[in-house]
Every structure is written in structure tokens, then in C-alpha cells.
Amino acid sequence: MQLDTISFNNPLNSETSEDTTKLPFTLGDLKAAIPAECFQPNVTKSLFYFFRDILIIGLLYAVASYLDSWLFFPIFWLMQGTMFWALFVVGHDCGHQSFSKQKWLNDLIGHLSHTPILVPYHGWRISHRTHHKNTGNIDNDESWYPVTESQYKDMPLAQKIGRYYVFLLAYPVYLFKRSPNKEGSHFLPSSSLFKPSEKWDVLTSTVLLIGMVGLLGFLTYQWGWMWLLKYYAVPYLVFIVWLDLVTFLHHTEPELPWYRGEDWTFLKGAISSIDRDYGLVYHIHHDIGTHVAHHIFLNIPHYNLLKATEAIKPVMGEYFHKSEEPIWKSLWNSCISCHFVPDTGSKVYYTSKNKSAKA
């Protein structure tokens, strides 16, 4: 795979995976390189992107309803599912408090963005916080973390199918059951995901989501199951595929290291991500492929990530990673190359089931 600036120096032939070195730059160095205005949300701009997405979604519904043609529906499904995903990314900014400096506004727009696409805003926001605090940590990361070679060999067939073959539909299951080998639900305040002080936030999002399910049920009662399928269920599935595809590719790549124990640090984990180019939809889904800078500084609004990325590249040098491959090729390569990591070692890499574990 061609990378923008580096191959991650994957030690294919080394006898140890211990990593006791320090990075040649600090979090402070990276922050100093980024223009101060990149950290400042612009409420007008943030609201523009939210209402832009809502407007496009509304127009797509109007056109689909007017034409009511099976020739158009496949186009509608793809476009509307993509816009559901774009709306999710707006709520993602709200969850990071990078939409605005007003928490009430972030929570309001977050719920307006996430509830219609059946995402519990606060429940997801909190678990996503756990992911960002532990990115690249095999033991503590929340999503898309690797299994070890021994875990892979002992994994039941049904779990292998879910993890390696139908993972692009995994998100709804994750909301109910959390990631493999972890317990908890995004809907229940008693889940280990949440602190007692977060109870009412979680309940609020859950109640609103139940209300959305009730609304869908009422509309289905009025207009029938075919209405639900044509106008909501299929776009929702497209959205789920987008969400799982993008988040999987953020952190699943043979050249990206994973850490255990004391060799893991926040910054090492944050830069163990990769930027990817999603072509025509790159800006439609709000530059979410610009992921390295986002993981380092969560409070940068999505519309400032490209500028921030260009600022940190010279500081990071060979530690900055960007794939120039087409997305379909990156997905294929990750699927056939990233099955498990070695059972031991403080710095390890994915390997394929068809190859010996990388040292």
C-alpha cells in the first residue's frame, strides 16, 4: 500500500516487539504548530452544515415520494443513506463539543442529528469518549480493537463470521451488546460504560430514541411495511455500512501499531490512525477521513481539520499516515491482512491468518 509519507516501520523480521522509545515530538509541539483559529468553532458554519444536511435529506425524500419509481429508489437509497451518515458526523462533532462552545446547543443538535437515525446521542457520545481516551490500546480501546492469535483460534464460528465477514452491519449490535468481550448497552444507565452521574443523560437519549421508534411504527401502521422499507430501512442500512466501513478503516491497517502496558501513551495511540480519501463523498461526509488530527485534538471542528492536518505534517514527519489507495482496495487489503495480533509484545501489528504472526 502506498502511504503519503511513511511505511510505519513495521518490524517484520525483528525478534522483539518491545517499544521503549519516545516520540520525537510532544502534544505541545503539535498544538503549537496549529493556527489558533482551528480550535475555535464557528456556530454559524456549524449550523450551516447541519441545516444543509437536513435540507438535502428533505429534498431527497420529496423527489423519491414524487417519482415513486423503482428505477429511482436504488439511487435514493444510496444517496439518502450517505446523507444519514453525514448527519451522524454532525452529531459526532456535537459529542466532542466541537460544534459550538455551548453545551446545550451541542446536545440539542446532537439529539436532532442522531435520534432520527436511531443513535442514542449521549450513550454513544460517552462510549466514543472511552475510545478516544484509549485509542491504540489493545486492552482498553472501545471499538475495532484486535483479537490475539490465541483468541482468534478459540473464536466460535458465529463470532468469526460476525467479526470478519458481516462486520459492515455490526453497529446496531454494538449499540445493544457493546464490542466483543465487553459488556454493556448504550441504552441502559446501569451499563458499565457509564458513570452514575451520567444516568439522566443516557435516559434522555434512550427515551427520545424510543419515541423515534414509536414514530416509525406509527408511520408504518399508516402507510405499510413497504413504505418503511423504501423510505427508511434501506437508507438506514446504507448508513450503517458507511459508519462501519469508515470507522473500521480508521484503525484497521497492517502498518498501524497497537500497544500494551506502559508503552502505550495517549499520543502514540492517537497517531496510530490513518487518513483516507473517500473521493466524491469526502466533503459530503464532513472530512471524516481526516482522522489523525481529529484523534490528537478532539475539539477541532471538522471544517478545520484539513488546515490542522497540513500544519502538523511537518512536525510529525514519518509518523503521519495517509493512504492514497482507493477505498475499496484499502478495505480488501485490511480484510485479508488484519485478522489478529501476537499474544505477547508491547508493540504489535496485525497479521493474516495465512501468515505467521509479526514479531
From Swiss-Prot:
It catalyses: a 1-[(9Z,12Z)-octadecdienoyl]-2-acyl-glycerolipid + 2 reduced [2Fe-2S]-[ferredoxin] + O2 + 2 H(+) = a 1-[(9Z,12Z,15Z)-octadectrienoyl]-2-acyl-glycerolipid + 2 oxidized [2Fe-2S]-[ferredoxin] + 2 H2O; a 1-[(6Z,9Z,12Z)-octadectrienoyl]-2-acyl-glycerolipid + 2 reduced [2Fe-2S]-[ferredoxin] + O2 + 2 H(+) = a 1-[(6Z,9Z,12Z,15Z)-octadectetraenoyl]-2-acyl-glycerolipid + 2 oxidized [2Fe-2S]-[ferredoxin] + 2 H2O. It is found in: Membrane. Residues 1-20 are annotated as: Disordered. A motif (Histidine box-1) lies at residues 92-96. A motif (Histidine box-2) lies at residues 128-132. Desaturase involved in fatty acid biosynthesis. Introduces a double bond at carbon 15 of linoleoyl and gamma-linolenoyl groups attached to the sn-1 position of the glycerol moiety of membrane glycerolipids. Belongs to the fatty acid desaturase type 2 family. The histidine box domains are involved in binding the catalytic metal ions. This is sn-1 acyl-lipid omega-3 desaturase (ferredoxin).
